[in-house]
Structure formats: C-alpha cells, structure tokens
C-alpha cells in the first residue's frame, strides 16, 4: 500500500488516503453532528496547514448547524467561512504564523465525553485526501492525549501571533489583555 499501487491491506487503526481517509474524517464529523442533535457534548478541534476540501467544508457547515462547537487552527489557506449565522456560527478559525513553520495535523473529537485524538499527515484538501498517500492514526495513550489537549489549548489561547477569520473572509488580529504566544 505504501506505493499506492498495491492491493490494500486491512488496517485496524490506521486510515490511509487515497482509500479511506476522507470517509474516516466525514464519519467522525457526522458522529459529532449526531451527538449535538441529541443534546450530547460535541466539539471538534482541528489543526492543519490548509482547509479547502468542499466535502469536508460542507460537513463542517452541517455539523455547525446542528450545534457542534468547532475550533479550527489553519495556518494557511482556508476556504471555509466562519461565523455566518445559520451556516457556520459555531465555527471559529484562527491562523497562527509565528517563528516556526509548523506542519502538525492534530484532530480532536469530543465524542460525547469520550474524546478521540488523531494525528496525521493530511490537510483537508482534495489533493491530500484523494491523490496522495497520507495517513491518520489515533492517539490512545492518556498521557499523550493530555499533552495534545494542552498544545491545542495553547494554540487556541494565542493572542500574540493569532489572527481570527471574520465572516466576510478577512482576518483580524486576536486581541487580549494577556499576551500568550504559542511559539514560545
């Protein structure tokens, strides 16, 4: 499978593109949507470099309309519009461009209080989900999960280098009386 030309094997925990990764992400987003519709805790935090896949964006809009709280940390291109009433009012997008060129892709799904953490190589872009060999794997160790949650919290709290995506598509600098920089 590593070449992309061989017969797919059965994988227990890994999700690979171009075969299963899109479906995995869509099912995780859909599960959060169902939790929200049924009044259960539902939240998505995703950190990546780019978000421009129409199918993923549509799924995020649907999840937002159902009440899922969605925080996206997207360093580069983001084709999603956040904060639009009736469409994406539960979605917040921030971009952090600091000292380091980060390439981490981290995904958190609240899952009704049974949080699931994933890391991988793919951004939410058609070329990553459909045309490249990419991987997603779960983080199951509770100590690592705690560390990852801490990292995400720091990223979401950054007020020094973060810019917030507005509903009209432009970014504004995050402001706060406390200055926290994620890249320190």
Predicted features and spans:
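Hydrophobic pocket-lining residues within nucleotide cofactor-binding pockets
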Residues: 51, 124, 182
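Conserved small/polar residues in nucleotide/adenosyl-binding loops
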Residues: 178-184
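HKD (HxKxxxxD) catalytic microenvironment of the phospholipase D
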Residues: 1, 5-8, 96-167
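Primarily the HKD phosphodiesterase
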Residues: 27-92
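A glycine-rich phosphate-binding loop feature that marks nucleotide/adenosyl-phosphate handling sites
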Residues: 13-21, 47-53, 77-80, 166-173
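Conserved structured core elements
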Residues: 19-27, 42, 50-58, 71, ...
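Active-site cores of enzymes that catalyze phosphoryl transfer or operate on phosphate-rich substrates
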Residues: 1-28
């Amino acid at each position: 499978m590593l070449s992309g030309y061989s017969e797919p094997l059965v994988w227990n925990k890994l999700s690979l593109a171009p075969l299963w990764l899109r479906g995995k992400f869509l099912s995780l987003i859909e599960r959060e949507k169902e939790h929200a519709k049924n009044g259960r805790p539902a939240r998505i935090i995703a950190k990546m470099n780019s978000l421009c896949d129409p199918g993923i964006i549509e799924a995020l809009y649907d999840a937002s309309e159902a009440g899922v709280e969605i925080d996206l940390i997207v360093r580069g291109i983001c084709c999603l519009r956040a904060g639009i009433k009736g469409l994406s009012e539960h979605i917040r997008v921030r971009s952090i461009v600091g000292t380091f060129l980060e390439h981490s892709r981290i995904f958190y799904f609240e899952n009704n209080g049974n949080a699931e953490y994933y890391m991988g190589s793919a951004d939410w872009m058609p070329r990553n989900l459909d045309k490249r060999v990419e991987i997603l794997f779960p983080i199951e160790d509770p100590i690592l999960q705690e560390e990852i949650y801490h990292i995400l919290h720091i990223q979401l709290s950054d007020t020094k280098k973060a810019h917030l995506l507005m509903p009209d598509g432009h970014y504004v600098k995050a402001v706060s009386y406390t200055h926290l920089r994620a890249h320190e």
